[in-house]
Amino acid sequence: GGEWFTLGFMGNFQFKLNDPIRSTELGISAGLSIPSILFIPDKLFITNVPRTEINIGYNYQNRPEFTRNLISLSYGYNWRSGERFFYNLYPLQMNIINLYNLNSSFYESLKDPFLRNAYRNNFDLGSGATVYYTTDASTIPQNSFFYARWTNDIAGNVLSLFNSSLPVDTTGARTIWNTPYAQYFRT
């Protein structure tokens, strides 16, 4: 026992009276948290309650500048070591972003390459890990405390091993399901 199932819905509607311009965002997410580490021996986690996390989500955004669909899937583990260290390890993280009806003047107004990249189709398959340390892990700390978090994400490197068999789009990017895949390491 001890499994947790979560189901979330979200919605956002923006409009002005007597103005035809509207913005809509809708989303759904589901998650299953299992109180053990699947596919890894539990004896490695004797002093804590490890959990396996499986999550899936969908988000739809319709704005005057663009329409975007986002699909996410993740599989991972979280556990703690003692009272102060917490760990998340996600061997599988996948995000698919499909953008259409992009307003060209809106896109051209984006000067920052990071922002421009947020408005492109993208297939992101990778892994991630987080280590979190705190001097007070209580739910409601009574005193000042310190915390530090270190996160790493890596994507696309395994996919790059198959570059020779992947199709190429008009920009020269390798694609999966007609969508360029991301390749990066960030910390």
Give the predicted meaning of each segment.
Residues 1-4, 21:
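Membrane-proximal, glycine/serine-rich, low-complexity loop/turn segments characteristic
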